[in-house]
């Protein structure tokens, strides 16, 4: 191989190594973001289950019967 060809190959290898390093960093950052989002989704699902449970356990005794309601002022 000629000296020029060896330099070209070394340059290409260096470029590929740089690209690989950046890709590895990007993958790590994406993995961290995904992990945080999954934790947030899990927390939100737990909160939603809690709220749904509260709503299901509410009784209608706080609501007045329609016949007991006073008519609105424009009546």
From Swiss-Prot:
It comes from the Bacteria. Pfam families: SlyX. Gene3D superfamilies: 1.20.5.300. Belongs to the SlyX family. This is Protein SlyX homolog. It comes from Vibrio atlanticus (strain LGP32) (Vibrio splendidus (strain Mel32)). The gene is slyX.
């Amino acid at each position: 191989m000629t000296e020029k060809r060896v330099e070209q190959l070394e340059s290409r290898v260096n470029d590929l190594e740089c690209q690989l390093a950046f890709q590895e960093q990007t993958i790590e950052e994406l993995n961290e973001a995904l992990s945080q989002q999954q934790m947030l989704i899990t927390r939100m699902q737990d909160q939603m289950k809690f709220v749904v449970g509260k709503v299901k356990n509410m009784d209608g005794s706080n609501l007045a019967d329609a016949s007991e309601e006073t008519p609105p002022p424009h009546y």
